């Protein structure tokens, strides 16, 4: 049961050529006789594509020093993947990202950083709906709660990579784009939730109306 980072691989591109990529992997289960195994592997990230970077020399310099960009993503409904794979992958990504940013500050005099770390959002989508025990729950609330604890510990580790900058006169501002809550129902309401349509906006645009109760309040 070892998490293995930056496993090299090849992936086909749209033009039919092959691209160098990296994945993260973890062997979750292995039968004693070798007859069966359960292996998790992440999505593939390009190890060579510098097009999203500007100026592009930053990509070349950072990857030479800290390795390739870290694959990230989300898989839900499996406790070991959520807790032992997704979370470990995001922890690895946070360290890589913070190493690159601190390097640019120290070596190239960067004075302003806008850092987006998608861990809390992506992890929340994997476990938020199952934080409340339901008729089809595969895990207890306490087990899923530990996923949330792990998420915020990893986020704290990421923020901690920059706290030394406070002693150098930097100001650190933390923002969240939105919140996620565990639904009360045993089904997705679809309208007004984070996976469906925001009813308020649709009402304002005149594309939908809400049912009313006897007091003429939206239901």
Name the predicted role of every residue range.
Residues 128-134, 187-201:
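Short secondary-structure boundary/capping segments
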Residues 1-138:
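His/Asp/Glu-rich, glycine-adjacent segments
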Residues 28-31, 102-107, 164-165, 172, ...:
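A general structural signal for short secondary-structure junctions and capping/turn motifs
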Residues 125-165:
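Extended hydrophobic/aromatic segments used for targeting, binding, or gating
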Residues 160, 193-219:
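Substrate-binding rim/cap in mid-to-C-terminal beta-strand-loop elements of soluble/periplasmic
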Residues 100, 104, 116, 151-154, ...:
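Generic, well-ordered alpha-helical scaffold segments in large soluble proteins
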Residues 150-196:
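Metal-dependent active-site segment of extracytoplasmic phospho-/sulfohydrolases and closely related
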Residues 89, 93, 144-147, 151, ...:
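Conserved acidic
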